[in-house]
Curated annotation (Swiss-Prot):
Residues bearing the modification N6-(pyridoxal phosphate)lysine: 51
Gene from which the chain derives: acdS
Name by which UniProt lists this protein: 1-aminocyclopropane-1-carboxylate deaminase
Source organism (scientific name): Ralstonia pickettii (strain 12J)
Domain of life: Bacteria
SUPFAM superfamilies xref list: Tryptophan synthase beta subunit-like PLP-dependent enzymes (SSF53686)
Amino acid sequence: MNLQRFPRYPLTFGPTPIQPLKRLSAHLGGKVELFAKREDCNSGLAFGGNKTRKLEYLIPEALEGGYDTLVSIGGIQSNQTRQVAAVAAHLGLKCVLVQENWVNYSDAVYDRVGNIEMSRIMGADVRLDSAGFDIGIRPSWEQAMDDVRKRGGKPFPIPAGCSEHPLGGLGFVGFAEEVRQQEAELGFKFDYIVVCSVTGSTQAGMVVGFAADGRADKVIGIDASAKPEQTRAQILRIAQHTAELVDLGRNITERDVVLDTRYGGPEYGLPNEGTLEAIRLCARQEAMLTDPVYEGKSMHGMIDMVRNGEFPAGSRVLYAHLGGVPALNAYSFIFRNG
């Protein structure tokens, strides 16, 4: 496998820490050891997160090509767009963000706090759009790029989650290689890796990266899109493409993609009671905050699987904390009593 042939622009601090979740593990019976790899602490650029790791492989093209404006898209409380705005500010580039109405959640402050607030503070041109949720290529995003061109700019396209970009899976191939180095220091290997999946490239990169040592199907994606078949197909497609890019040496098949569909409801961006319980439990046991859109759902999945005995006794499970905590501010009414 050859990831090193791709240029990488450093936007992160370096290897993200792996934290043992001792109190949460004990609370859930102590038969399974839980750990978290803290991608939520990976950068000083506006709280970072998993997209910052991905952007390290996209940004060289933007800089070398003389692009002057990063153009991206997401929901109103998109972590992706906040991280793109941060990278643009860091590099002295312009930034246009399309923020679509992906979540059926009504709160007077929803479009004024959290991620979108930070993007505005960092100087991004934030454009609200009424279109609903979808993980594919969006007309509003293409229109934003046309607008930049008409003004004489040169837009660099960054799709939702970086996932439709040809290099969108590379960052989390690097994640897997980083985990292997840390496992050598820890003296053991993780039996399972749990990760939230929506647009697909995070899990796709992990599948390829862990396929190198036979653990592709030990990456357990927790769907948070509530459109799991579309997400599953996108993970597989991105993983197959990424495997070719890095010369994995074997094909990625449907068997390699594990996507648990039990925890994504009621729909994208809306937490269920299990999501909220998981957010509170993790916060009160470990002071590790998760959000109602993504990490609260993957945390719910991992907790539920431990409680149900779905991980064999003695398993070591690595939870990939992808970030997203700024979105908590947009759901303050739900947590008004804690």
